[in-house]
Amino acid sequence: MFKKFDEKENVSNCIQLKTSVIKGIKNQLIDQFPVIEQWLNQIMPKKDPVKIVRCHEHIEILTVNGELLFFRQREGPFYPTLRLLHKYPFILPHQQVDKGAIKFVLSGANIMCPGLTSPGAKLYPAAADTVVAIMAEGKQHALCVGVMKMSADDIEKVNKGIGIENIHYLNDGLWHMKTYK
């Protein structure tokens, strides 16, 4: 999604949101990530301006004080940015890939089933279409945000094909954007 993303070329406009819209977004975030509820006022303080940065390909990035927090495509589900995930790692369930998969994930490749079932990997129970943080064997922080394409049980049974779709990874265009004023 953000492999060839560039702030100067892909951002079309930025609008400040009304309080009623912010409330709706906060409720949507709580529905999607129940764990985040007690931290939401810390992540999105009431007095700080909340803006939506609109980009090409119908991508919207939610910002507070210029800090990129969440993004979505076409009114779909929100995904946390990796910078937010590094501050609050508990907001998403984790899956762990082995060391051999790291370079492929960091180049934007989807996570294949064998990379989740090999000895260095850890596959935790999760349903299909769940948003997950991808951790790496021996690393502390998440290296990508992904969406489960199969349930964890199916990944273990089939052990072929794409297990998790890579949505946003370290060093992609969104990671390089850092802040938006």
From Swiss-Prot:
A GO-annotated cellular component: cytoplasm
Q: Where in this chain does the record put each PUA domain?
A: 92-171
Which domain of life does the UniProt lineage start with?
Eukaryota
List GO molecular-function terms, semicolon-separated: RNA binding
The record's principal subcellular location, in a coarse class, is cytoplasm
Indicate whether rRNA-binding appears among the record's keywords.
Answer: no
What subcellular locations does the record give? Cytoplasm
The answer to whether the entry has keyword Cytoplasm is yes
UniProt similarity note: Belongs to the MCTS1 family.
Please give the record's comment on domains. The PUA RNA-binding domain is critical for cap binding, but not sufficient for translation enhancer function.
Q: What is this protein called?
A: Malignant T-cell-amplified sequence 1
Question: What taxonomic classification does the UniProt entry list for its organism?
Answer: Eukaryota, Metazoa, Chordata, Craniata, Vertebrata
